[in-house]
Amino acid sequence: MTTHNANTTLFIGLMSGTSLDGIDGVMASFPNDVVNQHRATTLASAYVPFSAALRRELMTLQQAGDNEIERESLVANTLATHCAACVERLLIDAGLRADQVRAIGVHGQTIRHRPELGFTRQTNNPSLLAELTGIDVIADFRSRDIAAGGQGAPLVPAFHQAVFANPVETRVVVNIGGVANISILRQQTKEGGNALDIGFDTGPGNVLMDLWVKLNQGKDYDENGAWAAGGTVIPLLLKACLDEPYFALPPPKSTGRDLFHEAWLAAKLSLFPQFSPADVQATLAALTASTIADAIALHAPDVKLVVVCGGGAYNPYLMQMLGRALGKRGLVVQVESTEALGIAPNHVEALAFAWLAQRFDLRLPGNLPAVTGAVGPRILGALYPAG
């Protein structure tokens, strides 16, 4: 049984990302004092996988289709029950009661992200989640930033700044989920404190690799990058992929499955009808590593440490390729997972949404305008009370 310290407040963070694999959850304890209120301690973690049927339905909702409103509403209810199951596991594992938790910060599942049109949609049913758990729920974190002229993404760099910045060296945090994004954490400024210089989505993370291995082997992902490691990068295909205009756009910018999907990949592959599937997988890994390395070389040439979180941190082949890609760009830099800094790579995003829930609870801004492009700091989220 966990003893709840009266000097801390408990929040749950729930995250399901563009990989569409399941829900990662953490039970986090935050100190109540102002100086250390960002220093989260993970008391428990849980993972609830999506069924193949739910993944298919979420995938179809990424693009326009028939009867979308009803299908999305039903999926939202299913996601809420999955989230509730994750919360139940966290409470059991932490030895805590629902009434000891201040709030749940839940991201939901992105099915549309159109900041250029002024909206984003993360499907879930936070009202149902509050009813099922008896805990206040804070959701819809991205819309407020978009309303203020921002991209609504990435939001996690604000958390990266709070927990990973170092006063004497520039660090880059790389989150490799379905999409990859970077947070550049500058060394201490003359005025004191660390400045997050910039953060943005670099392009595909695991999304294209996962898609290709699913199409060819029926697997959800390439374990340890073993299939890619057995292939050879196709230079002309890599160049064709790198010609995507998104990569040349200046930040702030964000992307997702709206751009990097099966049709995008098929269009690139149509230029090269003769190819080995393993070679394509190796090329897609090189695409992820190259676009991350290009972004770091351009925006953080003084980087001293690159730390990686998300599912990509568990792919040794991809980690190796990233290190090589950085070296080819003249960056002799240490590449580690966030485990080296005390947080498991698969916990970072869920912890970030527990932190964002805490920020909402304290009525503090959760976005970084330098990252998202919003006109100013904004309090993110909407409250769904349990009572």
Language model features with spans:
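Phosphate-binding/catalytic loop of phosphoryl-transfer enzymes
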Residues: 4-10, 115-120, 127, 135-219, ...
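Short helix-loop-beta connector
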Residues: 5-8, 97-100, 167-169, 300-304
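Conserved ATP-utilizing enzyme core subdomain
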Residues: 8-10, 22-50, 194-289, 293, ...
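Glycine-rich phosphate-binding/hydrolytic loop that grips phosphoryl groups
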Residues: 20, 149, 282, 286, ...
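Conserved non-catalytic scaffold segment of RNase H-like nuclease domains
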Residues: 38-78
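Short beta-strand-loop/turn "lid" adjacent to the catalytic site in phosphate-handling enzymes
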Residues: 65-124
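Phosphate/ATP-binding catalytic cores across multiple sugar-kinase/actin-like superfamilies
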Residues: 82-90, 277-302
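Glycine-rich phosphate-binding loops at beta-strand->alpha-helix junctions
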Residues: 111, 303-325
